[in-house]
């Protein structure tokens, strides 16, 4: 890559060995002078070589993960430096999991609730720590790709799971980092580009007419890298409507291009992606039709840069997202009854940070314009816009602009990290002035392997266009909704070694003006769902997890490579009102248990077994009766042969063939089996 790092290099002279397990790794990118070693010292070193070889890879991987920069603050911090709890799903975890979509993969993250109305991510609501799908920020390479129309479309990722390097999950309010949609946290998906020119192809098939095929090609030429990928997925689905027709079928195509330039003074990255999906919606949005249908299309473009000054860094980015949606409450019954919507989001981020002896200081601004034109959402338009390919117009719309300014300072000492900042934000929609949302994170290393942390953070969320204007088919929106606000306290402890990693955290969230859809069942079946602001909603939660990497203790040939188990508990203290049914705010996972293990059966033959138990609080109505969600257990597994250039796999979800519901009246599929292969080669 021919990078000139002379300005940032420093000399290190080894005079003696230490017990620090990462001493050699920490010398990378530094000029190293080897001091004189006596013969007795060399003899002692030689005796330790054999034992060290069994755990070098585990230590190196742990150090590598600790030094990954994550987006939990405005200035870049590594996992080991971050004062907040940031969960990282690395490439190995992604490859081993019995999952074919990002949505399915996130089910195994303990603080994340994935509620599916369809299979393999056909329609998915993702939330964090008991929040709703509208209360998190979804990012792709650090770019906010949330759809202001509705969080139902937030998981329309224009990139295939095979192109992902890692997924970062930041739990808890992140207003000072991500702005006006990160009320309960953020999920950042980071893609990868091959380091050398090459290509890969994959194909798989399975139950219910499932097929997925795709691949990518990359070209590396000096300082430039370019990679293009694409995939196609389809299935007949697992259910039928009363007339016997398909109502959970889907097909989706994705295309993604990414490139970068690595210069001496600046790095530049650029992206473009598209996702096109059609899927049967069963009874997703109402029980009076069991043959609903939806079409979505998402466009994504972004350009990012970062200067390479020794002390000052400038990180601008500009992006444009477009989302298109067509909803058919009665599938194929005439375009005049369909709902059409198109959102456009244009954003500019200007982030700066300065490194001094006092720490890292970040400051900057963000401008984000969100607009919608629709047949149902918004105010009447003076000049309607023609809908492409249809003899109808977008005759309603709304536009709002959010501007924010942030300031954050981080102090990093050998055993202590403190990060504090504030964001000032203003939106043209509410007509109010700037509001300030502060936050502070602190951590202290008690011993080499023990760290405690605590945080106080605040955030807000503007109502989605659906919450403001969706009035039809049993729904009545309120365009005068207020923005949600959140305060959160969190504390925890971490124990991190190459062989054992454990965390325990406790948090308390205090929310005001929380938005929800509620319905009063005492007023009869015709009473609509109404969007409202709850006065307040308090949440208390506990999360605990432990991972054992047995390769550190017995070497890479260990039969049980690793085992991890996690538990989450949530309690909301707002009492349920008689006859009032909540769609989202008062429906949450009270208990969640996740356990996973990776086994090395023989040579390159590996097995992943994943277990989940979930107990959800909430009610739904069916046939005029109020029903409570029942807890359920799911068991998934993946068997794979992992060679250098190819991989063969077979996997199954819901092996026990359980009947369960994530959303009322929408059953989830039973056992689902898939098998496939991947082949990689270099040019």
Where are these regions (language model features)?
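Short strand-turn segments of transmembrane beta-barrel domains in outer membranes
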Residues: 186, 191-220, 230, 245-249, ...
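Short acidic/polar hinge/loop motifs at secondary-structure boundaries
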Residues: 144-171
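C-terminal beta-signal and adjacent terminal beta-strands/loops
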Residues: 512-513, 561, 613-620, 628, ...
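Outer-membrane beta-barrel signature, preferentially recognizing the C-terminal barrel domain
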Residues: 286-309, 341-343, 400, 431, ...
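Flexible loop and strand-edge segments within Gram-negative outer membrane beta-barrel domains
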Residues: 235-242, 246-252, 266-345
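Gram-negative outer-membrane beta-barrel transporters
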Residues: 412-418, 508-510, 532-621, 676-680
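Extracytoplasmic beta-strand/coil segments of soluble accessory domains associated
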Residues: 103, 107-143
